[in-house]
């Protein structure tokens, strides 16, 4: 398995993967819209030979400054529970550190994301419409950014 940044030639395979994994096109359209808006900061694919078997996206938040949102993460059904998702999350965290990201937020299963260092208590300090036990954050900077509302990019508004 190879994990690398997406290429334009991967876009249709990413769209197909997201549609298949989520059973609808909403997440695939989200990634396309984030890309079109220039908000897609990190987009990695996991490949097995020529097949895209996983994808992770991190997008710029409007607030707090220097923050990213992890969404979506998808692994081909036949490859789930084999470490592909964990490898993508770890690679995305490394990539986020390389671009001086201060904090990453994700709305997801806390039992999954806490093993990578994500923390619900940290996320709870930041006002968000997604506040609750499934809203977690990972601090990458030496100090927490100033507390500010978590405001997602415009592409997320199109999900409603």
Name each region found by the language model.
Residues 45, 51-60, 66-74:
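Conserved beta-strand in the GNAT
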Residues 79, 83-91, 101:
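Conserved acetyl-CoA pyrophosphate-binding loop and the N-cap/start of the following alpha-helix
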Residues 107, 119-141:
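Conserved catalytic-core motifs of GNAT/GCN5-like acyltransferases
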Residues 31-35, 124-126:
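Short, solvent-exposed loop/turn elements at beta->coil junctions and helix N-caps
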Residues 94-108, 121:
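Conserved GNAT acetyl-CoA-binding A-motif
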Residues 6, 108-109:
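Conserved acidic functional residues
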Residues 113, 118:
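Conserved active-site tyrosine of GNAT-family acetyltransferases
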Residues 1-30, 38-52, 142-160:
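Short amphipathic alpha-helix that is part of the acyltransferase structural core
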